[in-house]
Amino acid sequence: MNKPAVIALVITLLDAMGIGLIMPVLPSLLREYLPEADVANHYGILLALYAVMQVCFAPLLGRWSDKLGRRPVLLLSLAGAAFDYTLLALSNVLWMLYLGRIISGITGATGAVAASVVADSTAVSERTAWFGRLGAAFGAGLIAGPAIGGLAGDISPHLPFVIAAILNACTFLMVFFIFKPAVQTEEKPADEKQESAGISFITLLKPLALLLFVFFTAQLIGQIPATVWVLFTESRFAWDSAAVGFSLAGLGAMHALFQAVVAGALAKRLSEKTIIFAGFIADATAFLLMSAITSGWMVYPVLILLAGGGIALPALQGIISAGASAANQGKLQGVLVSLTNLTGVAGPLLFAFIFSQTQQSADGTVWLIGTALYGLLLAICLLIRKPAPVAATC
């Protein structure tokens, strides 16, 4: 058993549960300090504030994990999250919410370091499967977290934050007492041994520029369903909240299944390039169908295609991780987290605006834009060459 990688999965699951726990109740907590008319604005600002802090600080924390080790940075990140949730649980004024979110965003390196641990402890050929499991663990946490948070929030809007703080404290103790990072056995030339840990961001990222563009754009496209799903299904099919929730739960469960099981199984038989193409084509087809379907029942078969598209990102992340030495995985994974959070800020703003402008005349426009962007990514993947020093092609 790959103990470091398994612990990384557990850390990711618990971290995602903590995030998911607070999602249903943060607006309720804001209502304790704000009039109803101001809740939505402050809710959006709090979410964006965390993401912006991640964009700025995730690469730096990833770099520190290369220099100081994965364990100290993981402990810092988990301590920051536990402090954030404790502060929110005890909050009695609005500024405490903002302070907690800022601290959590600055110290939030769990995702980057967990991915670095997976890269440290697995062979290049195994990374697609393990990155798929990592994504599935995060998805499972985001399914379980809101369910628990919703129930706890009925008792008190502060209770989910208490539970999230306890989860992070338990994870902190697990990392402190159990986690031992994998011993890096990667063979390096003598000059690389001296210089690799000090390699600049530009030197590291330049050979991976096109792959990083593909990663960023794929994550940006993923913000389309995350942003407009509720609005679109209510507008076109007149769905109520129960129907929307059922569809999202089904999509989340199937997405986790494809990432945890299907991506790894395919990686044993197919190249990463083939898996990426298959995932992008599945998503592009699903987006095209979403723009055209006219009845609510038609959504459910499309969910399978949307979930199937989830096999692309683990394969893409596996290829990108192969473009960095073991001494630079934290730096690289921090950049990927930063890019992901950047799409989390820009995507909802962009796609919500597009949907609002086209809802009355052509509410499927946003899905067609996603289809076109996938076409661009497929063309770019044909042009990408092998990045130095050890990355494969896309």
Swiss-Prot record:
<dbReference type="GO" id="GO:0005886">
    <property type="term" value="C:plasma membrane"/>
</dbReference>
<feature type="transmembrane region" description="Helical">
    <location>
        <begin position="94"/>
        <end position="114"/>
    </location>
</feature>
<dbReference type="InterPro" id="IPR011701">
    <property type="entry name" value="MFS"/>
</dbReference>
<keyword id="KW-0614">Plasmid</keyword>
<keyword id="KW-0997">Cell inner membrane</keyword>
<keyword id="KW-0050">Antiport</keyword>
<feature type="transmembrane region" description="Helical">
    <location>
        <begin position="159"/>
        <end position="179"/>
    </location>
</feature>
<comment type="function">
    <text>Resistance to tetracycline by an active tetracycline efflux. This is an energy-dependent process that decreases the accumulation of the antibiotic in whole cells. This protein functions as a metal-tetracycline/H(+) antiporter.</text>
</comment>
<dbReference type="GO" id="GO:0046677">
    <property type="term" value="P:response to antibiotic"/>
</dbReference>
<dbReference type="InterPro" id="IPR020846">
    <property type="entry name" value="MFS_dom"/>
</dbReference>
<dbReference type="InterPro" id="IPR001958">
    <property type="entry name" value="Tet-R_TetA/multi-R_MdtG-like"/>
</dbReference>
<comment type="similarity">
    <text>Belongs to the major facilitator superfamily. TCR/Tet family.</text>
</comment>
<keyword id="KW-0813">Transport</keyword>
<keyword id="KW-0472">Membrane</keyword>
<feature type="transmembrane region" description="Helical">
    <location>
        <begin position="198"/>
        <end position="218"/>
    </location>
</feature>
<dbReference type="InterPro" id="IPR005829">
    <property type="entry name" value="Sugar_transporter_CS"/>
</dbReference>
<dbReference type="Pfam" id="PF07690">
    <property type="entry name" value="MFS_1"/>
</dbReference>
<keyword id="KW-0406">Ion transport</keyword>
<keyword id="KW-1003">Cell membrane</keyword>
<dbReference type="GO" id="GO:0015297">
    <property type="term" value="F:antiporter activity"/>
</dbReference>
<feature type="transmembrane region" description="Helical">
    <location>
        <begin position="6"/>
        <end position="26"/>
    </location>
</feature>
<feature type="transmembrane region" description="Helical">
    <location>
        <begin position="42"/>
        <end position="62"/>
    </location>
</feature>
<feature type="transmembrane region" description="Helical">
    <location>
        <begin position="135"/>
        <end position="155"/>
    </location>
</feature>
<feature type="transmembrane region" description="Helical">
    <location>
        <begin position="243"/>
        <end position="263"/>
    </location>
</feature>
<protein>
    <recommendedName>
        <fullName>Tetracycline resistance protein, class D</fullName>
    </recommendedName>
</protein>
<feature type="transmembrane region" description="Helical">
    <location>
        <begin position="274"/>
        <end position="294"/>
    </location>
</feature>
<feature type="transmembrane region" description="Helical">
    <location>
        <begin position="335"/>
        <end position="355"/>
    </location>
</feature>
<keyword id="KW-1133">Transmembrane helix</keyword>
<dbReference type="GO" id="GO:1902600">
    <property type="term" value="P:proton transmembrane transport"/>
</dbReference>
<feature type="transmembrane region" description="Helical">
    <location>
        <begin position="73"/>
        <end position="93"/>
    </location>
</feature>
<dbReference type="InterPro" id="IPR036259">
    <property type="entry name" value="MFS_trans_sf"/>
</dbReference>
<feature type="transmembrane region" description="Helical">
    <location>
        <begin position="296"/>
        <end position="316"/>
    </location>
</feature>
<feature type="transmembrane region" description="Helical">
    <location>
        <begin position="364"/>
        <end position="384"/>
    </location>
</feature>
<keyword id="KW-0375">Hydrogen ion transport</keyword>
<keyword id="KW-0046">Antibiotic resistance</keyword>
<keyword id="KW-0812">Transmembrane</keyword>
